[in-house]
Amino acid sequence: MALNLSKKKTIVSKINQISNLALSAIIANSQGISVNKINELRKSGREIGVKMSIVRNTLLSLAIENTAFKCLKKKLKGSTFIAYSTKHPGSGARLFKEFEKKNKKFKITGAVFEGKLLSELEINQLADMPTYEEAIRKLLLTLKISIAGKLIYTLSAIKEKKETS
């Protein structure tokens, strides 16, 4: 479907606005994936604050020109599906990694975090990064275990002191 100039400008403007608000971005080649599967992925993304779109490479290239994601331009080939993480930096990467495991035709081609193009290993690390809530939960659990351990140690020391007296 041919797009007129005003529609193209609208798309570029919209992608540029999202790019300026996003914490990270990840792109993948979605060629060969059914529309139903893509729609399921988009639905999952909306639930966790990931904005996704399939955009022509030339329009995407223009939209990310003056943003932290301009280094993605080198990776724009084929059918590009881009996801921006707006709430947690690893959300999009985690979502795409899970989808890639289930769909062999879906290939992650690049990602950017804090203006840096990430390697495959770094993309995996970004996907594995805990969310804010998960990190707080782990911290509280560690503190709880630490406090409980100190209490047990103190009680056993008091018990030993009473037994020796």
Curated annotation (Swiss-Prot):
**GO terms (BP aspect):** translation
Q: What does this protein do?
A: Forms part of the ribosomal stalk, playing a central role in the interaction of the ribosome with GTP-bound translation factors.
Does the record carry Lyase as a key word?
A: no
Highest rank taxon of the organism: Bacteria
GO MF = large ribosomal subunit rRNA binding; structural constituent of ribosome
Q: Which NCBIfam families match?
A: PRK00099.1-1
Kindly list the organism's lineage.
Bacteria, Pseudomonadati, Pseudomonadota, Gammaproteobacteria, Enterobacterales
Short name of one Pfam family for this protein? Ribosomal_L10
Task: Name a single GO cellular component.
Answer: large ribosomal subunit
Sorted alphabetically, which Gene3D superfamilies does this protein's record hold? 3.30.70.1730, 6.10.250.2350
Q: What is this protein called?
A: Large ribosomal subunit protein uL10
**Family according to the record:** Belongs to the universal ribosomal protein uL10 family.
Q: Which UniProt keywords apply?
A: Ribonucleoprotein, Ribosomal protein, RNA-binding, rRNA-binding
Note the subunit structure. Part of the ribosomal stalk of the 50S ribosomal subunit. The N-terminus interacts with L11 and the large rRNA to form the base of the stalk. The C-terminus forms an elongated spine to which L12 dimers bind in a sequential fashion forming a multimeric L10(L12)X complex.
